Design a protein with these regions (language model features):
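Glycine-rich beta->alpha junctions and the first turn(s) of the following alpha-helix
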Residues: 4, 13-109, 179
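C-terminal helix-coil-helix/basic helical segment that borders enzyme active sites and/or dimer interfaces
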Residues: 91, 108-162
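Glycine-rich phosphate/cofactor-binding loops in nucleotide/flavin-utilizing enzymes
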Residues: 53-60, 65-71, 75-77, 151-202
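Hydrophobic packing residues in well-ordered alpha-helices of helical domains and bundles
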Residues: 97-100, 129-133, 169
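A short beta-strand->alpha-helix segment at the C-terminal rim
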Residues: 1, 5-9
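Short, glycine-/Ser/Thr-/acidic-enriched flexible segments
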Residues: 10-12, 21, 37-38, 136, ...
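Structural signal for hydrophobic packing residues in well-ordered secondary-structure cores
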Residues: 9, 37-40, 62, 83-86, ...
Length: 202
């Protein structure tokens, strides 16, 4: 079975190496253990009940991801990028503007759904809550894709040497790729929805 144990990362023989992402940030690390000693007194819950603890922990992470918060992210709406960009042709602008408006409508629906689930959760279980992580993180990725598209064909060109809004959009675009993995991938979320909302077999 799997047990959940807390370990002091400051003890000897633990080597932590940050992983630099496309965004330039390093929120994830590789952790190497070389004959590290873990105390049984630091075990959470009973032996072999670690998966239960891990699943409960992931629920909190999914709630955080559903709220579309991310450390170091900037608040740039695609429509604002669109208005200040002159890199698009007239036909392209109309097509992109349509996509942006559809994104804004979906985002508004997500906000309404979050409010509804908060109210429902006070009275018990809210089925819609299980879908929030999936729909909100997918839409957040779409948001940054639209921001990049609004910059035109050279939106991601020479990002390393760029500055200002272009650099911030590029960083957030790359970082957003983690949203549909952290807290349970989109594929895992769809399995949860199919089992607990639709009642389909595992």
């Amino acid at each position: 079975g799997i047990s959940f144990i807390l370990i002091n990362l400051k003890q000897p023989k633990i080597d932590i190496k940050p992983i630099k992402l496309l965004s330039g940030q390093s929120p994830f690390c590789q952790v190497f253990f070389d004959d590290v000693i873990a105390s049984e007194s630091h075990r959470i819950a009973d032996e072999n009940d670690g998966w239960k603890v891990a699943k409960r922990l992931l629920e909190f992470e999914r709630t955080m991801m559903a709220d579309m918060g991310s450390e170091g992210a900037v608040d740039i709406e695609p429509i604002e990028t669109f208005k200040t960009s002159d890199a698009l042709s007239a036909p392209g602008q109309l097509n992109l503007l349509t996509k942006i408006k559809k994104h804004e409508m979906r985002n508004h629906l997500i906000d309404l759904t979050m409010t509804r689930t908060q109210i429902e959760s006070k009275n018990g279980f809210s089925p819609a809550a299980l879908s929030l992580k999936y729909i909100s993180t997918e839409e957040t990725q779409a948001r940054w894709e639209l921001n990049v598209a609004s910059l035109g064909a050279g939106g991601l060109e020479n990002v390393e040497n760029s500055s200002g809004i272009k650099k911030e959009i590029a960083k957030s675009f790359f970082y957003s790729k983690a949203y549909t993995i952290a807290g349970g991938s989109s594929e895992v979320q769809l399995n949860i929805i199919s089992k607990h909302i639709l009642g389909l077999p595992s």
